[in-house]
Amino acid sequence: MLSTRNKRIGTVVGAAIITAVALTGCAGNSSSDSAAAGSGSGTWAKTEGTLVFGATPDQAGSDSNNKPLEDYIAKETGYKVEYYPTSDYTALIAAAVAGKVDLMSSGALQYVMAQNKGAELSAVAATLTSADVTDPGYYSEAIVAKGSSITSLADAKGKTVCFVDPNSTSGFLFGLYQLKQAGLSVDSTGADANGNPTFADFTAYFAGAHDKSEQAVASKQCDLGFAEDSVVTPAVAKGEVTSINKQYVPGGPLSISTTLPDDVKTKLTSVLQGATLDAIKSSGVTLTDGFTKGYFGAQKEADDYYAPVRDLCSSIPAGKCAK
């Protein structure tokens, strides 16, 4: 039976229990507040008074897609915000581990992997995926080309399967979980020339982005593939692909550096937890088409919300995300 949006991933991994911890924060500060750097001890990724923002490059135009949120954070905190460009998921994780970002918008898997590698980050909120939901979770969907003879994940054996990236939450880890549930072996048998994992029961192809995974399936470059629901839903509506399975995934975290001065962390936490779409629109920042199509606000969440992802990492070694 498919998961419903209100059925959190804790049920997927059995004993995992999600505890949403309310973080204490004071009221948001507007741009009229002093832009002075935070007081007390702490370190910044680049320079005092500048927040460096890292984001998952999972679709084309990621910088433009995140610009309104960056501008909103700058306006509400009084600090300068700079975007840290990364070419792929691995680069974002490396930047977080190296302490080159002060805040990060990512998938749950990148967050967990970065922490496991030593990144000093803590989630304070999770992003919503639709205007009509209050749960930040979303779905990893299994898709086939329109008219495909494949009707279940069990049919994927011996086929070419499109994934997004080995470090993708919904585009890889939760795709492997769905295949495992269908009876396929998801134990890696080695690595290809690019260092990506290989499997005995199917041929893995890594498209590099969610939209590219969908496009590869639609063009029949792959027999089956995985992508997040925000990409799949419009593709299904256009008649490009058919969704044959889906699995709930904890929403992508907005995380902040734990090394920032305490007052900066408090201010930034308050701003991120209050970053609704209405609040951003009302602030007067310029919106972009990519942003309004993909950002629907954030909900307060904490690190414990992602405990089930860590459990799934432990049960699927090919994910290479266990600590």
Description of each model-found segment:
Residues 48-74, 86, 109, 132-215, ...:
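Bilobed "Venus flytrap"/periplasmic-binding protein-like clamshell domains
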Residues 105-119, 175-181, 211-242:
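A ligand-binding cleft/hinge motif common to bilobed small-molecule-binding domains
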Residues 121-135, 236-249:
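Short beta-strand->loop
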Residues 1-24:
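Sec-dependent bacterial lipoprotein signal peptides
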Residues 23-39:
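Bacterial lipoprotein signal-peptidase II cleavage site
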Residues 92-98, 108-131:
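Acidic/His-rich segments in extracytoplasmic proteins that coordinate ligands and/or metal ions
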Residues 38-40, 45-53, 58-68, 75, ...:
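An extracytoplasmic/periplasmic, membrane-proximal ligand-sensing/linker region
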Residues 74-78, 97, 116, 148, ...:
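Sec-exported extracytoplasmic/periplasmic mature domains
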